[in-house]
Amino acid sequence: MKMERLQKAMAEAGVASRRASEKLIVEGHVKVNGKLVTELGTKVSSSDQVTVDGVPLEREQPEYYLLNKPRGVITSAHDEHGRKTVVDILKEGGVTARIYPVGRLDYDTTGVLLLTNDGALANKLMHPSFKIEKTYVAKVKGLISNHDLEPVSYTHLR
């Protein structure tokens, strides 16, 4: 039976990012088979019963969605100011899985965005240690001066 680190299992189940899962473990929110676990690196298998604050960890089937994010929508699962989020859009379309965006696009930006409940994939795509190259295409109105481009690193422009 395959064993994996508890924080990885939690991230893959969509509980939180790996780092946030580590914090939950250390702070005493996680039990494995009814026993409180506060040590990072604890290994679990698919047959272990994991709970976070008493809620069983559900190992969901991975789901992946591509959304053409419209302008005026927040790239987040929740917004404390009540603005519409990318997750709201998918829920309106019938998606019931606990999903979250991979990366972000600004409020006034449109573009394709990946949303998933696959924490392992999200981590591989977003964590700098994996060195995943990302390409952005920007369409601007008017001319861009050299002064406007100064904050952008020319070494990353093509």
Q: Language model features by range: what are they?
A:
Residues M1-E80:
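S4-like RNA-binding module at protein N-termini
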Residues N33, L114, A138:
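Residue-level signal for inorganic ion chemistry
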Residues A122-D148:
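N-terminal accessory regions of nucleic-acid-interacting proteins
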Residues K84:
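Glycine/small-residue-rich loop that forms an oxyanion/phosphate-binding "nest" at active or ligand-binding sites
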Residues T155-R158:
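Conserved small/polar residues in nucleotide/adenosyl-binding loops
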Residues D88:
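Short proline/glycine- and basic residue-enriched helix-capping loop/turn segments at helix->loop/beta transitions
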Residues G93-P128:
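Glycine/acidic-rich beta-strand-loop module
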